[in-house]
Amino acid sequence: MIALIQRVSQAKVDVKGETIGKIGKGLLVLLGVEKEDNREKADKLAEKVLNYRIFSDENDKMNLNVQQAQGELLIVSQFTLAADTQKGLRPSFSKGASPALANELYEYFIQKCAEKLPVSTGQFAADMQVSLTNDGPVTFWLNV
């Protein structure tokens, strides 16, 4: 399971011209689910996202997690994170989870995160437009 996290000052996701999820300060989490993923991996990744220290403390050092920074999460499903790009000029999605498994683990991941923080979401399998202001920029690839 993969999370591409970006520290943002604001982010939103639109579907068919309508904003369905919006946050202020926090993390935009682009979530990719792979074939071998399960709830245990989702638990580990949620814990890592919630506790990863990428917000500045009073000394301007990355020392606070999103909870300590009183931030929010915008979680968006992104199957392309599971792409194999090692060969050729076209990505292969053979490592990606089936839509049923991906949706189940996406919803489970959202539920786990929502136990700790305000969460907004995208729409699974929809064509979405994601807008953000990356603060830093600060972006990390987390894989469990």
UniProtKB/Swiss-Prot annotation:
Which of UniProt's keywords are assigned here?
Cytoplasm, Hydrolase, RNA-binding, tRNA-binding
One GO MF term on file is:
tRNA binding
Predominant subcellular localization, coarse grouping: cytoplasm
Q: Which Pfam families does the UniProt entry name for this protein?
A: Tyr_Deacylase
Q: Where in the cell is it found?
A: Cytoplasm
GO CC terms, sorted = cytoplasm
Span of the annotated motif Gly-cisPro motif, important for rejection of L-amino acids: 136-137
The enzyme class is hydrolase
Q: Which SUPFAM superfamilies match?
A: DTD-like (SSF69500)
Catalyzed reactions per annotation:
glycyl-tRNA(Ala) + H2O = tRNA(Ala) + glycine + H(+); a D-aminoacyl-tRNA + H2O = a tRNA + a D-alpha-amino acid + H(+)
Query: EC number(s) of the enzyme?
Result: 3.1.1.96
Offer one example of a GO biological process linked to this entry.
D-amino acid catabolic process
Query: Which Gene3D superfamilies does the UniProt record give?
Result: D-tyrosyl-tRNA(Tyr) deacylase (3.50.80.10)
Function of the molecule = An aminoacyl-tRNA editing enzyme that deacylates mischarged D-aminoacyl-tRNAs. Also deacylates mischarged glycyl-tRNA(Ala), protecting cells against glycine mischarging by AlaRS. Acts via tRNA-based rather than protein-based catalysis; rejects L-amino acids rather than detecting D-amino acids in the active site. By recycling D-aminoacyl-tRNA to D-amino acids and free tRNA molecules, this enzyme counteracts the toxicity associated with the formation of D-aminoacyl-tRNA entities in vivo and helps enforce protein L-homochirality.
- Oligomeric form and interacting partners: Homodimer.
Q: Which family does it belong to?
A: Belongs to the DTD family.
What does the UniProt entry state concerning the protein's domains?
A Gly-cisPro motif from one monomer fits into the active site of the other monomer to allow specific chiral rejection of L-amino acids.
Question: Could you tell me which PANTHER family the record lists for this protein?
Answer: D-AMINOACYL-TRNA DEACYLASE 1, D-TYROSYL-TRNA TYR DEACYLASE
Q: Could you identify this protein by its name?
A: D-aminoacyl-tRNA deacylase
Q: What's the source species for this entry?
A: Haemophilus influenzae (strain ATCC 51907 / DSM 11121 / KW20 / Rd)
Gene name per UniProt: dtd
